[in-house]
Amino acid sequence: MSTLSKLFQPGRIGRMELKNRIVMAAMGTGYCHHDGYVLDEYLAFMEERAKGGTGLLMTGVTRILSEVGMRPGSMGVYDDKLIPGLRDLTDIVHRHDAKICLQLHHSGTRTSEETRAVRSEEHTSELQSH
């Protein structure tokens, strides 16, 4: 038996069955619209990895709030209008018997000044009153 043979055997994470143990780590591609919509480029990128045999694909950072800036091209899950693109992404990955995992992200204090919509000092007095 090869040293790597287990890599190609089915695996499990909790109740989720995987066709193999090959996992694509989360990475930023910049292939989503600045408003968080999934673009065709991202669908094609993820499909190629699923088609190539990856068992589990992780998305790049996916913002949970529209008003918190992210790098251009990051996906969003903050509004129901984004669901159709997310559904397309899931369907494409599942079509190749792969699974997909969403990486939720909030920039917090790491948000750049250029993209930060709400400054923390604006809420300091609110917090101190509690």
Predicted segments with their positions:
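N-terminal amphipathic alpha-helix/helix-capping segment at the start of soluble metabolic enzymes
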Residues: M1-A26, V93
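Hydrophobic faces of well-ordered beta-strands that scaffold small-molecule active sites
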Residues: I22-A25, L57-T59, I100-L104
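Conserved, mostly hydrophobic/aromatic
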Residues: M24, R49, G53, V93, ...
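Catalytic domains of carbohydrate-active enzymes, especially glycoside hydrolases
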Residues: L43-L65
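Glycine-rich, proline-tolerant flexible connector loops at the mouths of alpha/beta enzymes
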Residues: M58-I83, L104-A117
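Alpha-helix-loop-beta-strand connector modules within alpha/beta enzyme cores
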Residues: M75-C101
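Non-globular sequence segments
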Residues: D91-H94, K99, H105-E121, S125
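Positively charged, low-complexity/disordered segments
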Residues: E126-H130
